[in-house]
């Protein structure tokens, strides 16, 4: 089957979001342009890494290329709305790529479908016919800053960590290794 690359050159929206309750959330990245919406499933850690690397890339393009990169998210780009429904997974993300397109002055994010084998780096940010399906999104530096800020909020919106061991607290409590397995009540979850 031929490779499918979903390209969003001027997305109306590109966001990280979740479906489900903290502790049982599924993470998605969703791109929308006109009437077309694509959602891909992604691991929480991948969202965190993408936000971190994107912030680093924005700093680098500001210093190396003199691009106009806002330090804070412009008010008109703050997006707190839920994911567009229905949320239908196109694929699960395996490899991710980031780049800077100097011609269009856009950050490029590419999300490749997970595969059983290793992904050749040559297919990342390339239009070769062989390789995993992909979503490629072009963002202005301001939109990239907004995406990274929302992604951080989404990642950190889960269960609160135990103040002793750092493991996530469940509403029913949690068995804390720092307390020799003593079950901490959910009151600890309500503190802090």
Predicted regions and their residues:
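Positively charged, low-complexity terminal tracts
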Residues: 1-192
């Amino acid at each position: 089957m031929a490779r499918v690359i979903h390209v969003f050159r001027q997305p109306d929206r590109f966001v990280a979001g979740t479906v489900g309750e903290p502790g049982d959330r599924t993470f998605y990245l969703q791109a929308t342009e006109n009437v077309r919406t694509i959602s891909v499933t992604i691991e929480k850690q991948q969202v965190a890494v993408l936000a971190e690397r994107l912030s680093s890339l924005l700093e680098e393009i500001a210093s190396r290329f003199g691009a106009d990169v806002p330090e804070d998210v412009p008010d008109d780009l703050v997006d707190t709305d839920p994911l567009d429904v229905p949320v239908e997974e196109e694929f699960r993300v395996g490899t991710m790529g980031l780049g800077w397109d100097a011609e269009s002055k856009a950050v490029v994010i590419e999300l490749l479908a997970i595969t059983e084998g290793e992904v050749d780096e040559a297919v990342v940010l390339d239009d070769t016919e062989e390789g995993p399906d992909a979503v490629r999104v072009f963002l202005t530096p301001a939109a990239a800053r907004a995406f990274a800020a929302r992604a951080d909020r989404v990642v950190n919106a889960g269960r609160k960590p135990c103040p002793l061991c750092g493991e996530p607290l469940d509403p029913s409590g949690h068995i804390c290794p720092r307390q020799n397995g003593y079950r901490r009540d959910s009151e600890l979850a309500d503190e802090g």
